[in-house]
């Protein structure tokens, strides 16, 4: 956790440098007193870094997302870093079984020559940490270059949708979304929501569920369609900021 917060400056730098690096973020309590319980506040910090952000519910999700994350992040029209996030304790401090892929398959090969940002000699050693010198000035071209590059990074994140949807079987999962009461969540909050739904149904209350798998890109249209019949939407989160509820609103 402290590693993520100490590395915050690097995340937007990776995105701006178009480096398809993957990090696995284990979301546990970040404030004192220390806790290994889930706390997705640091995911809130990652939302505007230019990274892809996926949120695993289970150990199986985490395993699958890690492998599939490389495939998406390394696409030439994407080529930005990805954070595969999972929740503390329920995923990080428990044991579970996962289904492994067949032994005779491997990840798609990565071709560095299809990098959308050519590596120039002045940038190659040890790694292209900084863009061309002309942007390091206080003038219009410096501002315009920086601003337009941020838009390109956001566009790259959006372009990842078409690669992500077939790999993850959609950006969301839906269960009984025709009901008037819905729970919309991500990560292990979805697992706890399923138990809440089971208890509510025992009392005659029918509740549907929407599981969000990718936070960046955020499935705005998918969520809008899934919740179009809902009169009440509950968004359980393991953080004090309520960032997922704001995205859904």
Per-range role (PLM):
Residues 57-58, 79, 108, 240-242:
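Phosphate/diphosphate-binding loops
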Residues 81-173:
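Conformationally flexible catalytic loops at phosphate/diphosphate-handling active centers
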Residues 64-67, 94-97, 194-196:
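A short secondary-structure junction signal
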Residues 1-41, 46, 51-74, 155-249:
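Thiamine diphosphate
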Residues 16-22, 41, 48-51, 76-81, ...:
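Short coil/turn connectors at secondary-structure junctions
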Residues 2-3, 25-29, 87-89, 212-214, ...:
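Short, ordered loop/turn segments at secondary-structure junctions
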Residues 22-26, 55, 83-87, 184-185, ...:
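Short beta-strand segments
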